[in-house]
């Protein structure tokens, strides 16, 4: 504080004012009493831990894609195993896959379907899977959890299922439904809210029974 008295600015100050200013500067610079007022330390908050993926859920071979599928299923209340089965048939997990008909991405979304379910970029794996999963949930709800009819709707459109009151007599659609339903191993998928679905499909597990990412 003797050093401060030698500065012109501080020599002009009255003793009480000088004492207050000196004390404030001393406290700020050393962190005593108030901490460093002008340069507070920002403590970085740790990122929340990712929920582990159950070991019995299929893998795409990519931890990033597996996480996208699991998270989309958890959010929408759709079994990730079902989503995996659909993606395996649609694109074999090739995220930039394109069909001659104009379908794009992991879940082979057509432009109208992407727009309908809020996907602005069909080439973005997360957006593609999110929209495709929303469509699957919509179809499951429309057809009361019937997996085969939902798959037929995904492939040929729900209008075709309504028209034929069942799986349309198209060779491609019938083969599509058979392959995916057998791969998934179920013919019924309950339509549930996400919290209930997580319990139904055993999505919340501890790290000892989860896959390693």
Task: Explain the meaning of each model-derived region.
Residues 5-8, 30, 84, 102:
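A general, composition-driven signal for non-globular sequence regions
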